[in-house]
Amino acid sequence: MVAIALCAGLAVKVLDAPHSFPSRVNPQPTGPPVVPGRTLRAALAAAVTFDPKPGAVDVALDGRVVVNANAGRLTSVRATTTTNWPLFGTLSTSGKRWQSNGPLVPGISYQVTATVSGSAGVAAKSTSTFRTLTPVATVTATVFPDGLTVGVAQPIVIRFNHFITTAAARTAVLQRFTVTESPPVPGGWHWFNNRELHLRPQMFWPVGEKVTVTSDLNGWNAGNGMWGEGTTRAQFTIGNAHVAVANLATHQMAVTDNGRLIATYPFSGGRDMYPTMNGVHIVLDRESVVHMVSSTNGIPVNSPDGYDELVYYDVHITDSGEYVHAAPWSVDSQGRSNVSHGCINLSPGDALAFFGFSRVGDVVWVVGGPRPPERGDHGVMDWETKWNDWTPAVVHNMFPPPAVKTRAPASRTPPRHAR
């Protein structure tokens, strides 16, 4: 049935009962469903992932903390230890990824809080905690020389407080040291034992060279459960080229300063039973007086070859106890024959002059004798180790890793006195 009604000139058609008008009061949405803000915030927070994973323990110290936003964009990330020590990082330009910049602190808990924003200004936070490992031991390093003017043969000596035995740790630690100098020169690294790493130039250092060594061992995996700790900075300058050539066959020592001959000293070297070591020695240290005792070299004091006395103007050139020093008892033999226990004997006047001239790292080059250099002796090992056994590097900024070599440590205590 259809009814027609006229009302003010407007015709309205009224449908039979089975038909009805579409609703105009609550129209149905035609777009995507509307998600409440609380639900969106929860979804944003759930889309944030952390590495290390939440609740992780024994986290390695050389890793990086990474936060990813799989929905929305990261607007801030705050990472701190439980003692409020901050861990800084970098947020990508896309806002999708944050990564920490530095190593982690050992044996402590971290809290990482990420803020992420989505559409329509909705923001959410997500938090994760983890704990780093506690090292079996921490490894530190010292650098020598530091704050000194040294001779042209002086190596850079890095000593660790624990044995570094794994190839991976030895390779990785090289990336922790930066060596800069002006101008750059060819150089090389060499491990002489498990605790001692040296660097020297291929040839003697240029006169006037200024060298800076810095390191950051934090986050270095030193192997066997040990981790590096601490930073170092050392600076030194290369002085004039002091080179003394001691000829055991002629009993004369020629001393030059930057290539200019300044003195020739008659001397007496080690006799047949106690020959002086050949090779390029470096001055290890100087002492105005040394109490020399023969028992330090296995010679009983009360034997015919024994001695126990104060010796003056001592320039130390080997671990085995060789010095250039004053020897008034052998003046008659100096320039004529070798009668010492291995040291280079000078007259008191010449010894005083040489003592005043010498500095750590100077060259004392011994030639003409029968005794070869001992490669484990700090006095000769740097310049008597063939250059092919060093890993070449340009002495400037970073160095490539060295060949891994393990040799018995050369002990320098207690001191030995050849006389």
Predicted features along the sequence, with ranges:
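Gly/Pro-biased beta-strand-loop elements
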Residues: G225-D332
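Acidic, low-complexity Ser/Thr/Gly/Pro-rich repeat segments typical of extracellular/periplasmic
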Residues: M1-N240, F267
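Conserved beta-strand and immediately adjacent loop positions that scaffold enzyme active sites
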Residues: T113, R176, Q252, Y313-D314, ...
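Surface-exposed, flexible loop/turn segments at secondary-structure boundaries
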Residues: W85, G219, L261, A351, ...
